[in-house]
Amino acid sequence: MKTTMNFTTSQDDVQRFSSSEDLRSFYRHFGCNGLELMPFPYWDGKKELPSACCPLIAPDMIVGVHACCISDWMQKDRDFLLEHYRRDLDFARDMKAEYVVFHVTQVSDEEGFSYHPLHSDEEVILAACELINALLGGQDYPFYFLMENLWWPGLNFLDPAVTRLLLDNIHYVKKGLVLDTGHFLHTNLELKTQKEALAYLNTMLDQHQELLPYIKAIHLHQSLTGDYVKDWLAQPRSLSEDPMERFRQVYEHIFAIDQHLPFTAPGVRELVERIDPLYLTYEYITHNREELAHFLESGSSVFAY
């Protein structure tokens, strides 16, 4: 199993490190083999450049690439979507990434605010399969294409039959799944403790036992924010008409739900060993280098013998 740290080519992440060697030394200190990289545009201080121009990133650092996924996509132009995702897939091929992560979900700003979905899991899955098959068909990509769960309609691991529907309708040979532990926990608003979270995950794995070999990667983190969601839904909410204010509202709300904190409960190591993935990513949202180091120290400690 290869272990990675999530990273982006955004200014927020890049400014934390002085050089490639500084970044490499940092993640190796916590036992990571490399990065799962999200290729945002790189800002050089004057203008935006392609992510490949980021001076911190060398191909030998990159184990996986996380596609820059569009959450509200089902009504968007197909050619636009294919062009958008092919940039990330071509980048992954150029960087010799071993896998790519792709969200299988559909959620608009309004759906995220109201928790009233407009589509069923099956509708999203079948639409995603059509897009993915068009995206990958006729290509010679060498990497695994791994589909990740969220807590919105689509892949959410709530029903093994729906998970199977996704896998059965993808033509790409090197297909698989990413289990994002924190995302799955958001499907149960009653969870209060990491112990309860771990039991909930293991129950899902029991139900998906036949499909466990498809889980090639884990995004390991947790946040127990059911009380926040219940309080949120108890009050009337409205989205601003101003695009920048609307963006702020949506992202503050999403980050309040999905906090990406270290998963440290006794039994986390056994959960990972049960799945036996090829890749494990410590996927955290942090404010600075010091907080990232603290989270990595805490999260990796569950694997110490």
Describe each region flagged by the PLM:
Residues 1, 82, 86, 96, ...:
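Histidine-acidic metal/acid-base catalytic patches
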Residues 1-12, 33-37, 61-67, 100-102, ...:
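Hydrophobic faces of well-ordered beta-strands that scaffold small-molecule active sites
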